């Protein structure tokens, strides 16, 4: 939902001037034809404590090379994650993550690898090792795109132009 339209400087860039982004990934454990285009159907039991532990661990790291696509043109794989948490909302398992930037495919890779830990296919220590290995081969699959949503993008106030007439952001 668009909550406002703002004027910006002519040299502003919607991607490069953003100071943070928030993503949400939704998972449903029962088949539902009304949700199949917007939620990842994942019929397996998961350990919420392990999911939360993995999500918490993500905030302690900045190098996400293990969750980057190969042969990308990014100059750095460093990202600062400020919020990372799983919850239940309307019978969906929901992952919310906020950071200053994200690599292409990073959230989907993180979700898939955390789900492996939550199913007992990886320990939390092994999950940490995947992150620290800085090798994208170790995070070998990603969750489908249809569960992922960009929820919010924040910009610093100096990017937004003030209305000279009203003295506030347009």
Region spans (language model):
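Structured-RNA-binding interfaces characteristic of tRNA pseudouridine synthases
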Residues: 1-170
């Amino acid at each position: 939902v668009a909550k406002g339209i703002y004027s910006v400087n002519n040299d502003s860039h919607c991607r490069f001037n953003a100071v943070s982004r928030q993503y949400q990934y939704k998972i449903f454990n029962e088949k539902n034809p009304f949700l199949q285009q917007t939620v990842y159907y994942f019929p397996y039991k998961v350990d919420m404590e392990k999911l939360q532990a993995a999500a918490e661990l993500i905030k302690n790291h900045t190098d996400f090379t293990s969750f980057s696509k190969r042969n990308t043109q990014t100059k750095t794989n460093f990202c600062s994650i400020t919020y990372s948490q799983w919850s239940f909302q309307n019978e969906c398992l929901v992952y919310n993550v906020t950071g200053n930037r994200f690599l292409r495919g990073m959230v989907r890779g993180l979700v898939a690898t955390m789900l492996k830990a939550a199913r007992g296919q990886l320990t939390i220590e092994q999950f940490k090792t995947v992150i620290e290995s800085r090798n994208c081969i170790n995070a070998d699959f990603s969750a489908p795109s249809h569960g992922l949503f960009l929820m919010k993008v924040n910009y610093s106030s100096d990017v937004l132009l003030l209305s000279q007439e009203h003295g506030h952001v347009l």
